[in-house]
Swiss-Prot record:
Keyword annotations from UniProtKB, A to Z: Ribonucleoprotein, Ribosomal protein, RNA-binding, rRNA-binding
SMART domains in the cross-refs: Ribosomal_S15
Gene: rpsO
Role according to the record: One of the primary rRNA binding proteins, it binds directly to 16S rRNA where it helps nucleate assembly of the platform of the 30S subunit by binding and bridging several RNA helices of the 16S rRNA.
Name listed for the protein in its UniProt record: Small ribosomal subunit protein uS15
Subunit structure: Part of the 30S ribosomal subunit. Forms a bridge to the 50S subunit in the 70S ribosome, contacting the 23S rRNA.
GO MF: rRNA binding; structural constituent of ribosome
Biological process annotations from GO: translation
A GO CC term attached to the entry: cytosolic small ribosomal subunit
Species the sequence originates in: Shewanella loihica (strain ATCC BAA-1088 / PV-4)
Length: 89
């Protein structure tokens, strides 16, 4: 299940550089993090849902690659983002 429009709009307001910024690395990572956190509740209830687990792993890998890119290019923004999101890095 995807995120609601209100949640997405709040993430865009919190992490976007501008009003219509949907493609910056910070916004993409924040959206993926919210979706990953949302799916964790699903997996507590549906332990054997392996098809959705594959999608979750794809999201985690995508987020990992985006974070590696951000760390390589703009380390200050990377540090700020992981602090805001509470990621263990």
């Amino acid at each position: 299940m995807s995120l609601s429009k209100e949640v997405k709009a709040q993430i865009l307001a919190d992490f976007g550089r501008g009003e219509n910024d949907t493609g910056s690395t910070e916004v993409q990572v924040a959206l993926l993090t919210a979706q990953i956190n949302h799916l964790q509740g699903h997996f507590k209830e549906h332990i054997h849902d392996h098809h959705s687990r594959r999608g979750l792993l794809r999201m985690v890998n995508s987020r990992r690659k985006l974070l590696a890119y951000l760390k390589r290019t703009e380390n200050e923004r990377y540090q700020e983002l992981i602090k805001k999101l509470g990621l263990r890095r």
